[in-house]
Amino acid sequence: MKYEDLGVVPIINACGTVTRLGGAPLHTAALAAYDSAAQHSVAIEELQIAVSQQLSQWLDCEAGLIASGAAAALTLGTAAILAGSDLARMEALPDTTQFPNEILIACDQRSGYDHAVRAAGAKLVAVGMNEVVSGAGVRRVEPWEYAAAITDQTAGILYVQTDCSRPILADVIRVAQEHGLPVLVDAAGEIPPVENLKRLVDSGADLVAFSGGKAMRGPQATGLLLGTRTLVGSALLQMLDMDDHPQLWTAPAEFFAADEVGGMPRHGIGRGFKVSKESIMAVMTALEKFLGPQQATLMNVW
């Protein structure tokens, strides 16, 4: 079937990789990987573990997973921050009334995209003020304002990465680390340049979400969640199909210590963000090509 069979006329996309126009053309190698993956069955948990190991080698991160988009990665990352390895908290989400649920965010980083974070049960707390926008001065949100907003209900910090984000990420991470809080970075559209993949992972952020589509040219409905082993592991447990026998299941040793998870979780809040084996292999192939030697050419085109 073609678009025309449904009465839809293909358009000339002169806008870029935006989702509303279908994103970028899928890389031909990714398309071939998708077709090949469709011919066989695999255990998705095993596949995601292998993906995590490969992402670790490529990007020098502790762990990673493939989700059904950057927004899905943000929801999963938030769920991991809120629940950790606590089965009762995983089961409770998005009800967070019994444990810390506040996520700090700079007031001028709020947008409709942060609905993905609120969907996990987080309460966003806007920090600071932007005097530039109001015409009242030249100051924007400053690091001390994050510290001043921290309470016993604070679970973490959301940082939206752009070239003009302020304070800079390093200053926010410093405040977070001083208070023992994790930082989740929304970097959905921050590639190219390819260096941002490693730079943001190496920044000290606990979790970073990227789109697997856009310039990477994987399936548009894929995303990467990269970060610490335990938080990525929590996100994975809350996304996987848990229709298994409790006596046969053990928590993946690649993410958790032997006694860290007290049993088998039920289907989690991330169940709706499952990603197919075909999409996983396609985005991993696209990423492999994206990390290749043609980056100078790509940046010139970009």
Each model region followed by its residue ranges:
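A glycine-/small-polar-enriched, mobile loop at the entrance of the PLP active site in fold-type I
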Residues: I12-A50
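Internal helical hairpin/lid segments
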Residues: A286-W302
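Conserved PLP-enzyme active-site core in the AAT-like
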Residues: K2-P25, S52-F290
